[in-house]
C-alpha cells in the first residue's frame, strides 16, 4: 500500500510540475518545448536541467527539487538560454557562449561555472522568480 501511495504522490507531483512549466513558458511567449527526463545527453549527472538549442527544448529532471522555488529557478535558468537563442539566433549565441567558455579556460576557471552566460542565466532566474513567480506557485 505504501508503495502505491508513493507512486500516486510522485505522479501528482509530476503533473503539478508539468502545469507549472507550461504556465511559465507561456509567460515568456516562447515556442520552446519542455520535456521531463531522468538523464541528459550532455553535461554531468548533477544537472537539474539543460537546454537543447538545436531542438529548442528544455529538459528538466522530474524529481530531486527541495522546493517548488528550486524547480522554478531551474526552469527559468534554462528559459534564459532559450530567450537568448531566440534573440541572437542560434549561430550567434553559440559563438558568444563558446567565447565565454574560452575566456574561462584562459583564466584557469571552469568552462561552465565561470561562463558569463551561465552566471547571467542564474541571476536572471533568481530575479524573475522574485518578480513574477514567488507568490504564484506555493510549496506544500
Predicted regions and their residues:
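Proteolytic processing junctions in secreted/extracellular precursors
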Residues: 2-13
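Soluble non-cytosolic domains of exported or imported proteins
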Residues: 11, 15, 69-70, 74, ...
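Short pre-active-site segment immediately N-terminal to the catalytic Zn-binding motif
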Residues: 58-75
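Active-site recognition of the HExxH zinc-binding catalytic motif
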Residues: 73-86, 121
